């Protein structure tokens, strides 16, 4: 579960390395899970890239350490909390996605991120 002040690694090549959650988008939401959109501040970034430190960006959560329970009875858990930076059209800013992503992103209409990911779990 991601909440305000949570740090996430960035799983794309947009230029940011770490982001900190500012707000979970939605009506009075406290926690974000896989597939939820958050507003975040860039805390660590690579130089000469598209995203700079202290930029405020939107991102979609693609991996969480918290257990994700599926309707089939399976549960899945990742090693880190990760997000992909997106623009207002819900398209990723980067051109590559690193690491596995959850299948729930396809149900939330983030098909571009799913197609860029090397593995969908």
From Swiss-Prot:
Coiled coil: none annotated. SUPFAM superfamilies: Ribosomal protein L14 (SSF50193). GO terms for cellular component: cytosolic large ribosomal subunit. It comes from the Bacteria. Pfam families: Ribosomal_L14. CDD domains: Ribosomal_uL14 (cd00337). Keywords: Ribonucleoprotein, Ribosomal protein, RNA-binding, rRNA-binding. GO terms for molecular function: large ribosomal subunit rRNA binding; structural constituent of ribosome. The keyword Ribonucleoprotein applies. The keyword Repressor does not apply. One of its GO terms (biological process) is translation. Belongs to the universal ribosomal protein uL14 family. PANTHER family: 50S/60S RIBOSOMAL PROTEIN L14/L23, LARGE RIBOSOMAL SUBUNIT PROTEIN UL14M. Part of the 50S ribosomal subunit. Forms a cluster with proteins L3 and L19. In the 70S ribosome, L14 and L19 interact and together make contacts with the 16S rRNA in bridges B5 and B8. This is Large ribosomal subunit protein uL14. The gene is rplN.
């Amino acid at each position: 579960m991601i909440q305000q002040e949570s740090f996430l690694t960035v799983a794309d090549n947009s230029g940011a390395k770490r982001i900190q959650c500012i707000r979970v988008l939605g009506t009075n939401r406290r926690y974000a899970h896989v597939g939820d959109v958050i507003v975040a501040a860039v805390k660590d970034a690579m130089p000469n890239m598209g995203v700079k430190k202290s930029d405020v960006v939107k991102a979609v959560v693609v991996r969480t350490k918290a257990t994700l329970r599926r309707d089939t009875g399976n549960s899945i858990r990742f090693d880190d909390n990760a997000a992909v930076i997106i623009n207002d059209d819900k398209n990723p800013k980067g051109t590559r996605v690193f690491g596995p992503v959850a299948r729930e992103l396809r149900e939330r209409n983030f098909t571009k991120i799913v197609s860029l990911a090397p593995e969908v779990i």
